[in-house]
């Protein structure tokens, strides 16, 4: 363990990640100082009584006298107080950097604009079914630092967001993948998509194997080194999806391994997620039979293209996790019906480019129901659109227009934070309303 004794350590943010950082040091007898710009952060009640806390703002005096600052993923490095600290050469890191310094077992890491939680969960399920003791977490579920508490793990499988990668410098993995890079979080990255991409690419540093998307050059490494690259694709290469007798198949080395329709999950984007998971399991030398059986029976994660209600030949799909344009496009591309798609869009678009969404909507029978902060902006994508204040009012409007064979899709292409606690709360609200209205 790297020595932190005698250093003034400041932790910014008291969400679940910040609390994991507090506990990491507290268990090692190391004093920290905590600050959060909220007066009542969610996890304050779990903080030991003898740890100094500053609430309602950032304490600049604490920051400029610190030797180490640990920030939660939601805290921007562009915060004026952190810019001052950086100029003073004070070290600023996140929880994943702490985890990377302490972890003594092999690590697999996954990032991407979309699909990373699904892939992380798929690989985790395969590894567990193979008999491995696995710690699964990071941006999904258990904070990475909390995984260190279980000493029996043989492998860590961690999902990483771009926010976490910003403050990660020494992560070493046996395999890492960037699933895709599309416009997202542009409100966080003032220099645009290339700045966002370069942060994602940090996951390849010190990776023994890089798993890249051959269809998305933005996932390709910019620096050559001795690590191995394995590609996956929607149509070409060693690992790909191919059509055979009108069916999609997972193919490896021209061998047709699994008919995609045999899997419980649906959607072409999920077939690619399964393909990436197979690559990781091959790297781990897990028997193919275990991998393929696990993928067949993997039922997906809540709020991700999840059919939550069916009645009168009308399907209601909860895709609340689609918080960006590319994810909504992937959902729409997976739907092929004769009826109408009633698409719920709404929330904070995060300054995203909406033109790609406009193109796909023009080519399908789609009615838009727009709500929340950017409802007016979203409604301009199509002439067949309705503006409502809330998700509830949008769904009441949908009920007036439904016919047999239609699909109602919540795939908002936006952050939920303008009206909901998170995407989960939004998805749960949709599910309850669908079961009531439908």
Curated annotation (Swiss-Prot):
Its main location: cytoplasm. One of its GO terms (molecular function) is UDP-N-acetylmuramoylalanine-D-glutamate ligase activity. GO terms for biological process: cell division; cell wall organization; peptidoglycan biosynthetic process; regulation of cell shape. Pfam families: Mur_ligase_C, Mur_ligase_M, MurD-like_N. InterPro entries: Mur-like_cat_sf, Mur_ligase_C, Mur_ligase_C_dom_sf, Mur_ligase_cen, MurD. It catalyses: UDP-N-acetyl-alpha-D-muramoyl-L-alanine + D-glutamate + ATP = UDP-N-acetyl-alpha-D-muramoyl-L-alanyl-D-glutamate + ADP + phosphate + H(+). Pathway: Cell wall biogenesis; peptidoglycan biosynthesis. Its EC number is 6.3.2.9. It comes from the Bacteria. Gene3D superfamilies: Mur ligase, C-terminal domain, Mur-like, catalytic domain, NAD(P)-binding Rossmann-like Domain. One of its GO terms (cellular component) is cytoplasm. Keywords: ATP-binding, Cell cycle, Cell division, Cell shape, Cell wall biogenesis/degradation, Cytoplasm, Ligase, Nucleotide-binding, Peptidoglycan synthesis. It is found in: Cytoplasm. ATP binds at residues 112-118. Cell wall formation. Catalyzes the addition of glutamate to the nucleotide precursor UDP-N-acetylmuramoyl-L-alanine (UMA). Belongs to the MurCDEF family. This is UDP-N-acetylmuramoylalanine--D-glutamate ligase. It comes from Wigglesworthia glossinidia brevipalpis. The lineage of its organism: Bacteria, Pseudomonadati, Pseudomonadota, Gammaproteobacteria, Enterobacterales. The gene is murD.
């Amino acid at each position: 363990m790297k020595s932190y004794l005698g250093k003034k350590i400041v932790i910014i943010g008291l969400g679940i990640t910040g609390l994991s950082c507090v506990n990491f040091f507290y268990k090692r007898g190391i004093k920290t100082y905590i600050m959060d710009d909220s007066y009542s952060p969610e996890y304050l009640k779990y903080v030991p009584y003898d740890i100094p806390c500053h609430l309602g703002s950032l304490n600049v005096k604490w920051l400029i006298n610190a030797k180490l600052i640990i920030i939660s993923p939601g805290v921007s490095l562009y915060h004026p107080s952190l810019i001052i600290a950086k100029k003073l050469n004070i070290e600023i890191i996140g929880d994943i950097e702490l985890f990377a310094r302490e972890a003594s077992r092999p690590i697999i890491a996954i990032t991407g604009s979309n699909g990373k939680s699904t892939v992380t969960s798929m690989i985790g399920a395969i590894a567990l079914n193979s008999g491995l003791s696995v710690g699964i977490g990071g941006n999904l579920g258990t904070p990475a630092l909390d995984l260190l508490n279980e000493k029996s793990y043989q492998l860590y499988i961690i999902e990483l967001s771009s926010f976490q990668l910003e403050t990660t410098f020494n992560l070493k993995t046996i395999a890492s993948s960037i699933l895709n890079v599309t416009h997202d979080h542009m409100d966080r990255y003032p220099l645009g998509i290339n700045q966002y991409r370069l942060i994602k690419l940090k996951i390849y540093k010190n990776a023994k194997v890089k798993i890249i998307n051959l269809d998305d050059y933005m996932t390709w490494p910019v620096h050559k080194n001795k690590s191995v690259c394995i590609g996956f694709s929607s149509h070409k290469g060693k690992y790909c999806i191919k059509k055979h007798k009108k069916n999609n198949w997972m193919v490896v080395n021209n061998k047709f391994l699994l008919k995609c329709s045999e899997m419980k999950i649906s959607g072409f984007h999920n077939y690619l997620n399964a393909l990436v998971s197979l690559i990781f399991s091959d790297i781990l030398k897990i028997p193919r039979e275990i991998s393929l059986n696990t993928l067949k029976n993997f039922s997906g994660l809540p709020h991700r293209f999840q059919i939550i209600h069916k009645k009168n030949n009308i399907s209601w799909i909860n895709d609340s996790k689609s918080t960006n344009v590319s994810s909504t496009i992937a959902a729409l591309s997976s739907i092929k019906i004769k009826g109408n798609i009633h698409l719920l869009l709404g929330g904070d678009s995060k300054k995203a480019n909406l033109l790609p969404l406009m193109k796909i909507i023009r080519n399908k029978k789609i009615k838009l129901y727009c709500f929340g902060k950017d409802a007016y902006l979203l409604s301009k994508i199509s002439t067949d659109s309705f503006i409502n204040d809330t998700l509830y009012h949008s769904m009441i409007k949908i009920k007036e227009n439904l016919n047999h064979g239609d699909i109602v899709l919540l795939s908002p292409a936006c952050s939920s934070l303008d009206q909901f606690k998170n995407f989960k709360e939004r998805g749960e609200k949709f599910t309850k309303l669908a079961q009531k209205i439908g």
